[in-house]
Design a protein with these regions (language model features):
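Glycine-rich ATP-binding loops of the HATPase_c
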Residues: 146-153
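Short alpha-helical segment of the dimerization/phosphotransfer core of two-component systems
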Residues: 1-6
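Conserved catalytic submotifs in the C-terminal HATPase_c
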Residues: 28, 53-63
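Conserved micro-motifs of the catalytic ATP-binding
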Residues: 21-26, 63-69
Length: 165
């Protein structure tokens, strides 16, 4: 549905513009353990529909000062991305350590092009509903809060968000 895609594209571009223009000023300590549990609960039905399991392998108390809405968008983008691009039936593993959050999923059996994954409108798959802006939005949030967002591939696709100490 082209109208739905255009609407999502418009909302994503507006969000990206707001992030880059510092329009999310309100900040507070965000409890990432609580946020992660809420996000996992929110995506549980979608994961079940894809016969996938969202598995929290490790969790530690971790909080960071940032805009709560952007923190929710950041975590949800990673989970949604893993569900959309992951192999149906394969588990998605999440780890929350003292200064890092990582999410690993099975998808294409080859690494993604590191130069392209955070670029706007670059899509690695054939999902026509995708706007190609989820990871660029995550990257913009990471840059705003001095977080390091990295991608690696070793028996699965792993995105890691590292928080400053």
């Amino acid at each position: 549905d082209n109208l739905g895609r255009l609407t999502r594209l418009n909302k994503s571009l507006l969000l990206l513009s707001k992030i880059e223009n510092e329009q999310f000023q309100e900040e507070a300590e965000v409890d990432f353990k609580q946020l992660l549990h809420q996000s996992l609960s929110d995506f549980e039905a979608i994961a079940a529909h894809k016969n996938s399991a969202l598995i929290l392998l490790e969790e530690t108390e971790m909080s960071y000062r940032m805009n709560r809405d952007l923190a929710v968008i950041l975590v949800n983008n990673f989970i949604k991305n893993a569900l959309v691009h992951g192999t149906p039936g394969a588990p998605i593993h999440l780890r929350l350590k003292q200064h890092a959050l990582s999410i690993t999923n099975q998808g294409t059996p080859t690494p993604l092009k590191v130069d392209d994954i955070f670029a706007r409108f670059k899509k690695s798959g054939t999902n026509e509903k995708s706007t190609g802006l989820g990871l660029p939005i995550a990257q913009a949030i990471a840059v705003k809060y001095q977080l390091q967002l990295t991608y690696s591939y070793t028996e699965g696709h792993r995105f890691t968000l590292t928080f400053p100490i």
